[in-house]
């Protein structure tokens, strides 16, 4: 997968290129990540990248010419088929389903805003889609871009090593993840559930699914609004609720 980022702070993306899952994927050639700094496309000795908004008001906007030229340079490097995304509070909220859709795109160019944002005409002429990571204010688009890159990269074949890891993540099937345990078997008086020690793979699968359903029911019940539960899921959720109401049955 090819990724381009338009940012005033390219050094921030070392968190993506040098560390963790994405760093390994880049090293192994599964991902490419390139950055373009609008400051490199300025024509004044101060390398100015901000400008006053028409109509007045507080703050500044990113200057049009350096930003537009940086996007064009990224498009040229990407070649045909690149999708330009602006990280914006007005955009579609990123979910696991959205990340899966974006992972099917082979080339993404992410535009990171700063100051009070960018000129609306840049959005109209240069941007294909706007995406948001949530309803809160950040200082720029870099952290949302890194979040999107990490979420999408995990879905690129080979990045996680085992595709099952991505398939079992929270939200991959619309549900929260089940609880996980490692050694020791007993920790401060709390025991690993016996089913996980028994070695019966089908029992373990059902337990994990039931816990996933139950955790979603308790913590994010609104997620069920977009799900059509199977007969097995409906039965396991009912068991979870029954056991929660009657602990002696568990």
Swiss-Prot record:
Q: Which residues are noted in the entry as S-adenosyl-L-methionine-binding?
A: 113, 133-138
Entry function: Specifically methylates guanosine-37 in various tRNAs.
Record Pfam families: tRNA_m1G_MT
Query: Species name for this entry?
Result: Shewanella amazonensis (strain ATCC BAA-1098 / SB2B)
Q: Does the keyword S-adenosyl-L-methionine apply?
A: yes
Heme as UniProt keyword: no
Can you quote a single GO CC term?
Answer: cytosol
This chain belongs to the protein called tRNA (guanine-N(1)-)-methyltransferase
| Lineage of the species this protein comes from | Bacteria, Pseudomonadati, Pseudomonadota, Gammaproteobacteria, Alteromonadales
Q: Which Gene Ontology terms cover its molecular function?
A: tRNA (guanine(37)-N1)-methyltransferase activity
């Amino acid at each position: 997968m090819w990724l381009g980022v338009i940012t005033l702070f390219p050094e921030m993306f070392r968190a993506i290129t040098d560390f963790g899952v994405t760093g390994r994927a880049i090293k192994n050639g599964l991902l490419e990540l390139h950055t373009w700094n609008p400051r490199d496309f300025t024509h004044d000795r101060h390398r100015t990248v901000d400008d006053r908004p028409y109509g007045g008001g507080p703050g500044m906007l990113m200057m049009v010419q350096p930003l537009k030229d940086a996007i064009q340079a990224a498009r040229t490097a990407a070649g045909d088929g690149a999708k330009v995304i602006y990280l914006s509070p007005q955009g579609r909220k990123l979910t696991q389903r959205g990340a899966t859709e974006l992972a099917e795109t082979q080339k993404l160019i992410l535009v990171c805003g700063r100051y009070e944002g960018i000129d609306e005409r840049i959005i109209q002429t240069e941007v294909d889609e706007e995406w948001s990571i949530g309803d809160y204010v950040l200082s720029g688009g870099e952290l949302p871009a890194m979040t999107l890159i990490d979420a999408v990269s995990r879905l690129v074949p080979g990045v996680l090593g085992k595709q099952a890891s991505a398939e079992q993540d929270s939200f991959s099937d619309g549900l929260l993840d089940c609880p996980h345990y490692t050694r020791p078997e007993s920790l401060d008086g709390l025991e690993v559930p016996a089913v996980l020690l028994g070695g019966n793979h089908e029992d373990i699968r059902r337990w994990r699914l039931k816990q996933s359903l139950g955790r979603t029911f308790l913590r994010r019940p609104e997620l069920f609004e977009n799900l059509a539960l199977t007969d097995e899921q409906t039965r396991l959720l009912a068991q979870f609720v029954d056991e929660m109401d009657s602990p002696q049955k568990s």
